[in-house]
Swiss-Prot record:
SUPFAM superfamilies, A to Z: N-terminal nucleophile aminohydrolases (Ntn hydrolases)
Biased composition (Low complexity): 232-242
Compartments (UniProt record): Cytoplasm
InterPro entries in the record: Ntn_hydrolases_N, Proteasome_alpha, Proteasome_alpha-type, Proteasome_asu_bac, Proteasome_sua/b
Cited Pfam families: Proteasome (PF00227)
Subunit structure: The 20S proteasome core is composed of 14 alpha and 14 beta subunits that assemble into four stacked heptameric rings, resulting in a barrel-shaped structure. The two inner rings, each composed of seven catalytic beta subunits, are sandwiched by two outer rings, each composed of seven alpha subunits. The catalytic chamber with the active sites is on the inside of the barrel. Has a gated structure, the ends of the cylinder being occluded by the N-termini of the alpha-subunits. Is capped by the proteasome-associated ATPase, ARC.
GO biological process terms, semicolon-separated: modification-dependent protein catabolic process; proteasomal protein catabolic process
Official protein name in the record: Proteasome subunit alpha
Family: Belongs to the peptidase T1A family.
Function: Component of the proteasome core, a large protease complex with broad specificity involved in protein degradation.
Classification of source organism: Bacteria, Bacillati, Actinomycetota, Actinomycetes, Kitasatosporales
Regulation (activators, inhibitors): The formation of the proteasomal ATPase ARC-20S proteasome complex, likely via the docking of the C-termini of ARC into the intersubunit pockets in the alpha-rings, may trigger opening of the gate for substrate entry. Interconversion between the open-gate and close-gate conformations leads to a dynamic regulation of the 20S proteasome proteolysis activity.
Length: 253
């Protein structure tokens, strides 16, 4: 009788983590940034039917990178949890922190179970507050851990490089156009450092806007509105460059 092949628990968990990370890395990256009036979600997504970003509840948004069918199941479960809790208790009792805890338990259970493969997903759960200080952003990797993020966060294939780029350039109090411009610039950078152009029709953009009078703060930005914001960001860049040139000319005089 042959001896069963033995794999240490540490090696088994390391293999599962590597499997999940490789699956997530095959997906396109996305970024979530705070700006003066809320939180913006930006990602490259050529599909108009399959969304990376979704509304979960009044002030809560959801973003995901990885396998679509897996994070879509999680999204649907999150919507059901939020609806049931809001109906049973109060709408204010539905929070991003509570939802992140539910997702963490689900992902952690699946990751540690030898009976099924780990989910190849990385999630972001965000809640817009009454003020920027009240905004909450949580990142949930494949293993179910929870990371409390501030300012900006990137997930997906090139997340580490994009996060470094954002950390160096993101500022508090940015306008939506400025935040959108920074997000697109970060997503346009390839792994070798070169830049490429992402057309507006390949961008998926959504916001949690605290200034909206409606109870539901989630809104998708598409079509002409997205084009206007991108043009405004480009115009502000050109204006800054022109001002810098004028200052240089004055100095030479």
């Amino acid at each position: 009788m042959s001896t069963p092949f033995y794999v240490s628990p540490q090696q088994a968990m390391a293999d599962r983590a590597e499997y999940a990370r490789k699956g997530i890395a095959r997906g396109r990256s996305l970024v979530v940034l705070q700006f003066a009036d809320g939180i913006v979600f930006v990602g490259e997504n050529p599909s108009r039917a399959l969304h990376k970003f979704s509304e979960i509840y009044d002030r809560i948004g959801f973003a995901a990178a990885g396998k679509y069918n897996e994070y879509e199941n999680l999204r649907i479960g999150g919507v059901r949890y939020a609806d049931l809790r809001g109906y049973t208790y109060d709408r204010d009792d539905v929070t991003a922190r509570g939802l992140a805890n539910v997702y963490a338990q689900t992902l952690g259970t699946i990751f540690s179970s030898a009976a099924e493969k780990p989910y190849e997903v990385e999630l972001v759960v965000a809640e817009v507050g009454e003020t920027p200080e009240g905004d909450q952003i949580y990142r949930l990797p494949h293993d179910g851990s929870i990371v409390d993020e501030h300012g900006s966060v990137a997930v997906g294939g090139n997340a580490e490089q994009i996060s470094t780029y954002l950390d160096q350039r993101h500022q508090d109090g940015m306008t939506l156009a400025e935040a959108l411009k920074l997000a697109v610039q970060s997503l346009s950078r390839d792994t070798n450092g070169s830049e490429r152009e992402i057309p507006a029709e390949r961008l998926e953009v959504a916001v949690l806007d605290r200034t909206r009078p409606q109870q539901r703060k989630f809104k998708r930005i598409v079509g002409r509105e997205l084009s206007r914001l991108l043009e405004a960001a480009g115009a502000s860049t050109a204006g800054e460059a022109g001002s810098a040139e004028d200052e240089g000319s004055d100095d030479e005089k």
